[in-house]
């Protein structure tokens, strides 16, 4: 993985020094590859092994631990991931996470993807199941699981498997759980970061954007406020 991170740095240097055309390679492409690598190295090369220390595996362990602990009250959890959404063939993080949760003992029907609810009727049905605790783990992207996703009733934990582009997206994600109508007095938000990758840069970038927005809104220096 370190070798691949170095490869991204080399590519960035070539882009900065104008050694490659923007059509060949550019910072957006490099950043996207960096985000994929931070999520799971198999998104860069499906032949690479599953890293036991990956953040997806850390998330699986934490989700299962909370699922087990809150069995009696049937508390629910949300996993947000904008990259590597479910697909029919080839590797994707959604199916990988679900398969591992099922292997640990969670019934498959209790782990659902928002992407499978492709009509308003199916969506309403799915949201109802999350609210009553029939579905206990819901996975989705910011776009599909943001505004209008009212499933807060039993939500006890929310997991950020990747970092969205905008501060508003983080607020949108967290707002699914931290709102009126949640029966839990205490809730947890987990952010998963892969060391020595684009992850810390991405979260730092979003935090700085938020400070800048706050500065404009309040006309204050973010360092002083």
Predicted features along the sequence, with ranges:
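Conserved nucleotide-binding/hydrolysis micro-motifs of P-loop NTPases
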Residues: 1, 84-86, 119, 144-146, ...
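Inter-lobe connector of SF1/SF2 helicase motors
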Residues: 1-51, 55, 64-65
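Conserved strand-helix element at the start of the C-terminal RecA-like helicase core
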Residues: 18-30, 72-95
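SF2 helicase motor core recognition
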Residues: 34, 124, 138-160, 166-186
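Conserved helicase ATPase core of P-loop NTP-dependent helicases/translocases
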Residues: 107-142
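A conserved SF2-helicase RecA2
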Residues: 165-174, 178-225
């Amino acid at each position: 993985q370190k070798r691949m991170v170095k490869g991204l740095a080399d590519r960035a240097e070539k882009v900065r020094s104008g050694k490659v055309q923007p059509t060949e390679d550019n910072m957006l492409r490099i950043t996207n590859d960096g985000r994929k690598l931070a999520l799971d190295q198999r998104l860069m090369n499906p032949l690479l092994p599953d890293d036991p220390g990956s953040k997806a595996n850390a998330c699986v362990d934490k989700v299962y631990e909370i699922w087990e602990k809150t069995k009696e009250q049937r508390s629910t959890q949300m996993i947000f991931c904008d990259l590597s959404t479910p697909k029919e063939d080839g590797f994707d993080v959604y199916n990988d996470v679900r398969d591992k949760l099922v292997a640990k003992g969670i019934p498959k029907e209790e782990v659902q993807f928002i992407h499978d609810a492709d009509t308003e009727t199916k969506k309403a049905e799915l949201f109802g199941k999350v609210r009553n605790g029939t579905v206990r783990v819901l996975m989705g992207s910011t776009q599909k699981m943001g505004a209008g996703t009212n499933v807060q009733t039993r939500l006890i934990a929310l997991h950020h498997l990747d970092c969205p582009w905008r501060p508003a997206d983080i607020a949108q994600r967290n707002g699914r759980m931290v709102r009126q109508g949640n029966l839990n007095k205490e809730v947890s938000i987990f952010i998963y970061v892969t060391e020595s990758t684009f992850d810390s840069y991405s979260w730092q970038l979003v935090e700085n954007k938020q400070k800048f927005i706050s500065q404009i809104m309040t006309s204050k220096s973010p360092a002083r406020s």
